[in-house]
Amino acid sequence: MDWKDVLRRRLASPNTDPKRKKSEQELKDEEMDLFTKYYSEWKGGRKNTNEFYKTIPRFYYRLPAEDEVLLQKLREESRAVFLQRKSRELLDNEELQNLWFLLDKHQIPPMIGEEAMINYENFLKVGEKAGPKCKQFFTAKVFAKLLHTDSYGRISIMQFFNYVMRKVWLHQTRIGLSLYDVAGQGYLRESDLENYILELIPTLPQLDGLEKSFYSFYVCTAVRKFFFFLDPLRTGKIKIQDILACSFLDDLLELRDEELSKESQETNWFSAPSALRVYGQYLNLDKDHNGMLSKEELSRYGTATMTNVFLDRVFQECLTYDGEMDYKTYLDFVLALENRKEPAALQYIFKLLDIENKGYLNVFSLNYFFRAIQELMKIHGQDPVSFQDVKDEIFDMVKPKDPLKISLQDLINSNQGDTVTTILIDLNGFWTYENREALVANDNENSADLDDT
């Protein structure tokens, strides 16, 4: 045999010599090949061991990674097509007008006041004539839900039509919010909700007077209310269902009304006067004009009678930057103090009062905060009130399950959480509570004087 042929065959098959020691990389490759082979055989062998595997629906869908551009585009397009289809299934204005015409045509006398009524038989007739889009509304369940005490077994046409309108609005709003749900998981992140509200501003006549430079502050003010109350665990996202279920979106969309009263605007957190008020307070507190609030600056909030002990806890527990509070953190603080009856606000304040992080307030916690109230009373020339008396009053008001501990749930259940927290953190609030009987008597005297005049 020609030595050239032998050498050529040897170079072409370097691993044929059984005496040759394999390299570390070759051993790893061989091990991986064997693992892949045996794993595939094992997996294939187990695939059909349980027939139920075929009927269990898939419940996990992996989201495309950032580098999977095609999958992301496919997901976005499919969601857009799905939402467009859902939108087309909703009643438009013309179809709603036609529905109202059919309901009015099939009303059954006598009317109740000015309310037109319809019985179940005609209700079903209207459902047949109204078209397939309306079929979901013309069910026995809906009729029974709206049936009250009418002796003829009828329902109010107006109530039914309002029900349909509300359902259509909810579905429209859900579709609108879902367009901003980037992940497609049924919730909105803070940035998603910010984009939604920012694009909503031009459609709200009551916000026409806002300068564009203020838009970012307005959006921050609006979004914080949603997240403060609907995201108590601070996960950074809110379910779209929760947004629809609460009244905040109604309050926001109320600003579409060009003739909204001044009183309604003042009580609506999302109105321009309210947003400007909150931001104006922040600017007034910011004496050094650095865009942040120090503890000393925040101490002038409201009546400037909050205790230093409470303010210390605010800056210990809340997110700060070099010991100063930004506007977003300030908004949480304001929402908590202005809504002390709400569970989310009580949760915020309770965390500050729970200095030992035990999940409850004991006599030590109450005394720790009330001593600061007593010190302020001395500074203002008032006689300090006995802590023992105040402690007994607090436990009497709350009536906790454990007679020595007050939990957050105890505060919420008692409906006295706002009073208890005010007593412990604000001298003016404590003074108002302590003199409540005199203040009530004074109000009665003033009202009597007005009646006499």
UniProtKB/Swiss-Prot annotation:
Transmembrane segments: none annotated. The keyword Cytoplasm applies. It is found in: Nucleus; Cytoplasm. GO terms for biological process: B cell homeostasis; positive regulation of B cell differentiation; regulation of antimicrobial humoral response; regulation of B cell activation; regulation of dephosphorylation; regulation of mitochondrial depolarization; spleen development; T cell homeostasis. Pfam families: EF-hand_13 (PF17958). InterPro entries: EF-hand-dom_pair, EF-hand_13, EF_Hand_1_Ca_BS, PPP2R3C. Residues 273-308, 341-376 form the EF-hand domain. Ca(2+) binds at D286, D288, N290, M292, E297. One of its GO terms (cellular component) is cytosol. Induction: Up-regulated upon B-cell receptor cross-linking. Expressed in all tissues tested including heart, brain, spleen, thymus, lung, liver, kidney and testis. GO terms for molecular function: metal ion binding. Its main location: nucleus. Disruption phenotype: Mice display a reduction in the number of mature B-cells and an impaired B-cell proliferation upon B-Cell receptor cross-linking probably due to a loss of inhibition of BCR-induced apoptosis. PPP2R3C overexpression protects B-cells from activation-induced cell death. Keywords: Calcium, Cytoplasm, Metal-binding, Nucleus, Repeat. May regulate MCM3AP phosphorylation through phosphatase recruitment. May act as a negative regulator of ABCB1 expression and function through the dephosphorylation of ABCB1 by TFPI2/PPP2R3C complex. May play a role in the activation-induced cell death of B-cells. Interacts with MCM3AP/GANP, PPP5C, and the phosphatase 2A core enzyme composed of the PPP2CA catalytic subunit and the constant regulatory subunit PPP2R1A. Finds in a complex with ABCB1, TFPI2 and PPP2R3C; leading to the dephosphorylation of ABCB1. This is Serine/threonine-protein phosphatase 2A regulatory subunit B'' subunit gamma.
